Amino acid sequence: MELVVEPLNLHLNAETGSTLLDVLRSNEVPISYSCMSGRCGTCRCRVIAGHLRDNGPETGRPQAGKGTYVLACQAVLTEDCTIEIPESDEIVVHPARIVKGTVTAIDEATHDIRRLRIKLAKPLEFSPGQYATVQFTPECVRPYSMAGLPSDAEMEFQIRAVPGGHVSNYVFNELSVGASVRISGPLGTAYLRRTHTGPMLCVGGGTGLAPVLSIVRGALESGMSNPIHLYFGVRSEQDIYDEERLHALAARFPNLKVNVVVATGPAGPGRRSGLVTDLIGRDLPNLAGWRAYLCGAPAMVEALNLLVARLGIVPGHIHADAFYPSGV
C-alpha cells in the first residue's frame, strides 16, 4: 500500500497493519514523538485522504479545521492514504523518561496555589510549554506543566488546590521538603515553536501561567525577538501571583508586553479589569500571522480558541493546553 506524506510530497511503500509512526520513523520522516503510547499527543498529524484504524484518544474528539487528526503511534495503516505532518521546524523529539527528584521548596504563591521546586537526579529535556506526570506516592499521581526551562537548576511546578482533590490535598497538607518524587515526561504539544518569526500571543489563566512562563522565557532567553503579548488572567486580586516576575521579564526584554487582567472586583494599579477575551478582542483585532499559546481552565481556553481563530490565526498555529480536572 502507498502512504503519501505532505507537505513533503513523499510517497512511501508500507505494509498493512504497521503503525503510522513506525513507517515514518523507518523512512526517516521528521515527526515529533515522545511517549509512544498515545498519552502525550506529540505525534499528532492530519489525515487528508483515505482511512487509518485509530486506536488512540483522538477517536471521537472534535476536530479543528478540515480533516481528521490521529496520533501516529496509535494509528494503524489499512489502505492507501495521505497524511499531513507538522512543519519540520516544529519537530521535537524528547524520549519520555522517568527521573527521580527531591522536593527542595514548597512556597505559598496564593491562598490556593503552591509552588513546588524539585531537584532532579538527572536532567530531563523538554520543550517550553510541555508538562510531565508527577508521582508523589503510588496513589498520588497527576500531570503538571513545567514553569521553567530544562537549564534551570531546579524544576518548578505550580499546583492549585482542587476541592476534594486527593492529590492537591496531599500536596497542601502532607508533602514536605525532602520528599522523593518521580517525574515522567515530557508530554504535550503546546510547546514553543522557535522558528516562528511573527508576533506571539501567550495567555495563561490561573496556574495556566506555568506553561506560559516556560514558553515566554524560552523564547526570550533563546534570543527570539518576536513581539510577545502576555495576558495573565485571574478571578480576583487575591489570585494574582508572580506579577513582579512578569514585570521583571518585561523590563529586561522590550519585545514583551505584560497584561495582568482581573475579572471581578478592584484590579489595582498597573492592572486591567475585565475578561481576557474581551481585552484581547479590543487590543488585537487582527491576529493574522500570529501564533497563540493558550493555557488554563477549559472554558477559557475554548473561548480563546474560537476568538483567536475568528481574529485570523490559522488552526495549526493555535497551541492550546486546557487544564481538565482529574477528579479526586
From Swiss-Prot:
Pathway: Aromatic compound metabolism; naphthalene degradation. GO terms for cellular component: catalytic complex. [2Fe-2S] cluster binds at C35, C40, C43, C73. It is an enzyme of class 1 (oxidoreductase). One of its GO terms (molecular function) is 2 iron, 2 sulfur cluster binding. Component of two multicomponent enzyme systems which are involved in the catabolism of naphthalene. Plays a role as an electron transfer component for both salicylate 5-hydroxylase (S5H) and naphthalene 1,2-dioxygenase (NDO) systems, by transferring electrons from NAD(P)H to the oxygenase component via the ferredoxin NagAb. The electron transport chain from the two systems can use both NADH and NADPH as electron donors at approximately similar rates. This is Naphthalene 1,2-dioxygenase/salicylate 5-hydroxylase systems, ferredoxin--NAD(P)(+), reductase component. It comes from Ralstonia sp. The gene is nagAa.
